[in-house]
């Protein structure tokens, strides 16, 4: 299935880094990010859902070969804003569960301060192949 343009751009800004436990990723926020003109005009701020998507993509990259889709957003605490050009460090853990779901918990920081804590459940994405019958 095709990835939406926002998810593709978030993925392009994300780099997985070595971590002794769990996963660590760096999100380098592109000043040209497609949602900035509307969120908010004159004072761009990265929408919180984009941080949720970055956590999902970082967990997906760490699990290698597992395409994930957001299931349930268990909790999201946003403690700061992310602006164009910021770098966000995402540190988290992803665990597989017997029901096939993946649980991801992550702390996000920027400029040395925690900016968000996100906990979510994801399911494996189903690839759509062929035309409908």
What would you call each of these model-derived segments?
Residues 56-94, 101, 123:
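Hydrophobic beta-strand-centered segment that forms part of the acyl-chain substrate-binding groove
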Residues 4-46:
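Catalytic strand-loop segment that frames the active site of acyl-thioester-processing enzymes
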Residues 8-10, 70, 88, 114:
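Residues that act as N-cap/strand-start positions at coil-to-secondary-structure junctions
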Residues 1-9, 82-86:
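Short, solvent-exposed secondary-structure boundary motifs
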Residues 11-22, 84, 93-133:
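HotDog/MaoC-like acyl-thioester-processing domains
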Residues 26-28, 77, 121:
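Generic structural detector for well-ordered beta-strands
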């Amino acid at each position: 299935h095709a990835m939406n343009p926002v998810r593709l751009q978030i993925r392009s800004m994300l780099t997985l880094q070595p971590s002794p436990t769990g996963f660590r990723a760096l999100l380098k926020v592109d000043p040209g990010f497609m949602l900035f003109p509307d969120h908010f005009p004159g004072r761009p701020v990265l929408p919180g859902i984009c941080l949720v998507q970055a956590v999902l993509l970082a967990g997906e990259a760490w699990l290698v070969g597992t395409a994930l889709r957001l299931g349930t957003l268990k909790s999201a605490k946003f403690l700061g804003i992310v602006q164009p050009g910021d770098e966000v460090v995402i540190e988290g853990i992803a665990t597989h569960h017997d029901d096939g779901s993946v649980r991801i918990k992550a702390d996000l920081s920027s400029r040395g301060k925690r900016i968000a804590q996100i906990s979510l459940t994801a399911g494996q994405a189903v690839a759509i192949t062929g035309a409908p019958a």
